């Protein structure tokens, strides 16, 4: 059972397919959601940096850290 859950969890994270989490316990569903949100925030940060670069804008330290 644990091995099956581990495989389901790993596939859910790899695919980012929320429907793939249907057979996971609630705590694992929350982890998939947490990882997905973290990845989204990470990518949005890079997107903002790319916009700054394209506009030749140098953000303040506070903007950059945010």
From Swiss-Prot:
Keyword annotations from UniProtKB, A to Z: Cytoplasm, Lyase, Manganese, Metal-binding
UniProt-listed Pfam families: Terpene_syn_C_2
Source species taxonomy: Eukaryota, Viridiplantae, Streptophyta, Embryophyta, Tracheophyta
Cofactor: Mn(2+); K(+)
InterPro entries per the UniProt record, alphabetical: Isoprenoid_synthase_dom_sf (IPR008949)
Highest taxon above the source species: Eukaryota
Reactions that this protein is recorded to catalyse: (2E,6E)-farnesyl diphosphate = (E,R)-alpha-bisabolene + diphosphate
Family listed: Belongs to the terpene synthase family. Tpsd subfamily.
Disulfide bond positions: none
Name assigned to this protein: Alpha-bisabolene synthase
């Amino acid at each position: 059972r644990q091995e099956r859950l581990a495989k389901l969890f790993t596939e859910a994270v790899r695919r980012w397919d929320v429907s793939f989490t249907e057979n996971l316990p609630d705590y694992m569903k929350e982890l998939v959601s947490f990882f997905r949100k973290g990845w989204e925030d990470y990518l949005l940060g890079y997107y903002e940096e790319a916009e700054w670069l394209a506009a030749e804008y140098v953000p303040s330290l506070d903007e950059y850290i945010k």
